Amino acid sequence: MGMRMMFTVFLLVVLATTVVSFMSGRASHGRNAAASDLIALTIKGCCSVPPCIANHPELCG
């Protein structure tokens, strides 16, 4: 294999890696948002229960 061919293969590998990384990052945004919503609901539930407020005052501000 010549230098041009090796460089072309290198560029293709870098491009493929970048595309896969970019697409997997976008796919996880929805899961992160759902997890944040669940955490917020859990904290709100804790703030309405006096024993939970006593154990975790930092959550309820």
UniProtKB/Swiss-Prot annotation:
Q: Where in the cell is it found?
A: Secreted
Please give the chief subcellular localization of this protein. secreted
What does the UniProt function comment say about this protein? Alpha-conotoxins act on postsynaptic membranes, they bind to the nicotinic acetylcholine receptors (nAChR) and thus inhibit them.
**Domain characteristics, as noted in the entry:** The cysteine framework is I (CC-C-C). Alpha4/7 pattern.
Q: Which residues form the propeptide?
A: 22-44
Q: Which residues form the signal peptide?
A: 1-21
Q: Does the keyword rRNA processing apply?
A: no
Q: What is this protein called?
A: Alpha-conotoxine-like Am1.3
InterPro entries assigned to the protein according to its UniProt record, in alphabetical order = Conotoxin_a-typ
Record keywords, A-Z: Acetylcholine receptor inhibiting toxin, Amidation, Disulfide bond, Neurotoxin, Postsynaptic neurotoxin, Secreted, Signal, Toxin
